[in-house]
């Protein structure tokens, strides 16, 4: 279980990124977080794994306090959290399999990973992760040869190889075309359903949030302004969260109608 208790984050210069967040996420939930740019979505995820320190309040991660945690405690917390990034964060010059094996770093000695002497069990786990996202046939090619959607699937497989209790996806489809975005969101939803991994996804496109989410969290100016079941969400809900009317730019359907997206190449 994850619990935020009166959590605030203030950056240098006095910018308050999170304001008095009270939030509980149960094991196995699939939660979508929405809000305008600067609303605090990324800060919420980064505060959970200790990348951004909370300046007030407490964060409980499966019984361990994140705020003020020691270096060893933070390493343990982060080993239980798989991160998926908007920019993929892959090593493009090496193979897809080697990228996924990076998710096993906390389980092997430094010399083994340095020389690529991964245990057979770790290699098998990495291949299973690639199988789960549908690109096991790409295991031995360079990551640079993949499309954007395929690279994001490698990122998901790498997080999955970590055997996480929680997966955090920060705008995972922001750089992808509409078809590929739905494929990636489908992968995340299926992993959550099949493996019961608690999943938090930051999204910009509100129709994707409605299509794939089960619970919706809305942030505005660092404050929690909505928390409820996705079945109860309508356009008025999003207007309330954003503090303005919804535009085509807020919808994946708007991108489709415009006839283009950030990543023109769909990878099937």
Pin down the residues of each PLM region.
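Conserved ABC ATPase signature
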Residues: 142-146, 150
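Conserved ABC ATPase "signature" region
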Residues: 65, 108, 112-137
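Conserved catalytic motifs of ABC-family nucleotide-binding domains
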Residues: 163
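Helix-to-loop junction immediately C-terminal to a conserved catalytic motif
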Residues: 49
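ABC ATPase NBD Q-loop/coupling interface
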Residues: 58-76, 117-119
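Catalytic Walker B motif of ABC-type/P-loop ATPase nucleotide-binding domains
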Residues: 167-170
